[in-house]
UniProtKB/Swiss-Prot annotation:
One of its GO terms (molecular function) is ATP binding. One of its GO terms (biological process) is selenocysteine biosynthetic process. Belongs to the class-II aminoacyl-tRNA synthetase family. Type-1 seryl-tRNA synthetase subfamily. This is Serine--tRNA ligase. The gene is serS.
């Protein structure tokens, strides 16, 4: 959520930032609703003060009868009626909060202006792409190996699901353990095993609701399946005040993730790129406003480290204003090279959300010896999605005979297996 005080004091700048997100100017409407709300709150305070004064006089009166006493009683009753009506008006005046809840985060000054991914800015590349490399797509390889099943799975669960078998199932497990080990043993992240069912309020805190309600799966009793472990991880600090010396707090978690893929009809309908259910290792960092810029680079580097150890070519893109996620003020996308598609595809998104999520969930910190609290900054990064990493390995490590060479760093995790070959039932 955006800071209403900042909007109030920077109306022109606010409209300029909204225009960078391709949203029409809204400062005038917000200012009007804000004035109405503040007027009601001011009246409530005045009446509360008047009630306190008159109640004190009543309590100190020696005689609990007579015209003066009864007149004060009538005054207090009248004040209570006014307060009840004003508080009802305040509770019913949800338009301002509803409006604020629909605004995305304000872009950082370093974010390039642009409407879509074509305007994203290249930051760096890693590894070399070979235009003459073997170029079968991952689903062709997986099906030929008899280790990736879409057809029978569709009978069980419908489209956008997959069943992995044998050594591909083992590779999935190996990648999870490898990623968690790197992040915890080398990169100072603390492992968490969170729930995958959360309440709506946790989704709201993370910026998933109310804007993206249709993109998640809801149960019939008030829970939602998480679209990313970012949701439970950032909520670890909801409604807390953290001692400054404990920051940064860096968390890593592997979870299954669930997305309805609303609006993705016709996109990546074959293979494992876009599924309703997928596994992902997620990184979250909680830090101070002063350190969030450096922490953004750190958490992005953590995602890159996995790809470097797997020797997978990739590039880092700085997203433009029109391509950033809702809660982000600045985002790097990491795109891995896929020979089967002859293009880079997103494999990780690394975002600095500033105090956007913290304001929603009241996550604060304070210096030692101080009573003053400040909103934390939250950051998140994919570290990495297991399915898309498998896609990249299958396509970049494929051999002429259709087998898949295991990347060196995964051989021990695969029990010494160096190559995945076709499975014969």
């Amino acid at each position: 959520m955006l800071n209403i005080k900042w909007i109030r004091e920077n109306q022109k700048l606010f409209d300029e930032k909204l225009s960078q997100r391709f949203i029409e100017p809204m400062s005038s409407k917000i200012a009007m609703l804000d004035r109405e709300k503040r007027k009601i709150m001011s009246l409530i305070q005045e009446f509360q003060h008047a009630r306190k004064v008159k109640s004190k006089i009543l309590g100190n009166m020696a005689s609990k009868s007579g015209e003066e006493f009864e007149g004060l009683q009538r005054d207090v009753k009248h004040i209570n009626e006014k307060l009840e009506a004003l508080e009802q008006d305040l509770n019913n005046n949800n338009e301002l909060n509803e409006l604020l809840n629909m605004f995305p985060n304000i872009p950082d000054e370093e974010v390039p202006y642009g409407m879509d991914e074509s305007m994203n800015k290249l930051v760096r590349t890693y590894g070399e792409t070979n235009p003459n490399a073997l170029n079968k797509q991952h689903f062709e390889l997986g099906i030929k190996l008899n280790l990736m099943d879409f057809e029978q799975t569709a009978k069980i669960s419908g489209t956008r699901f997959v069943t992995l078998k044998g050594d591909l199932a083992k590779l999935e497990r190996a990648l999870i353990n490898f990623m968690i080990d790197v992040h915890t043993k080398e990169l100072d992240f603390f492992e968490i095993s969170p729930p995958v069912l959360v309440r709506d309020n946790a989704m709201y805190n993370a910026g998933q609701l109310p804007k993206f309600a249709e993109e998640s799966f809801a149960t019939t009793n008030g829970y939602r399946l998480i679209p990313t472990a970012e949701v439970p991880l950032v909520n670890i600090v909801a409604d807390t005040i953290i001692p400054r010396e404990k920051l940064p707090m860096r968390y890593v978690a592997y979870t299954p993730c669930f997305r309805s893929e609303a609006g993705s009809s016709g996109r990546d309908t074959r293979g494992m790129i876009r599924l309703h259910q997928f596994g992902k290792v997620e990184l979250v960092s909680i830090t101070t406003p002063e350190e969030s810029k450096n922490e953004h680079e750190y958490i992005t580097n953590a995602s890159e480290t996995i790809l470097q150890k797997l020797n997978l070519p990739y590039r880092v893109m700085l997203l433009c204003t029109g391509d950033m996620g809702f809660a982000a003020k600045k985002t790097y996308d990491i795109e891995v090279w896929l020979p089967g598609q002859k293009q880079y595809r997103e494999i990780a998104s690394c975002s600095n959300c500033g105090d956007f999520q913290a304001r929603r969930m009241k996550a604060r910190y304070k210096e030692f010896g101080s009573n003053e609290t400040t909103l934390v900054h939250t950051l998140n990064a994919s570290g990495l999605p297991i399915g898309r990493t498998m896609v990249a390995i299958l396509e970049n490590y494929q051999n002429e005979d259709g087998s898949i060479t295991i990347p060196d760093v995964l051989i021990n995790y695969m029990g010494g297996l160096q190559k995945i070959t076709a499975y014969s039932e």
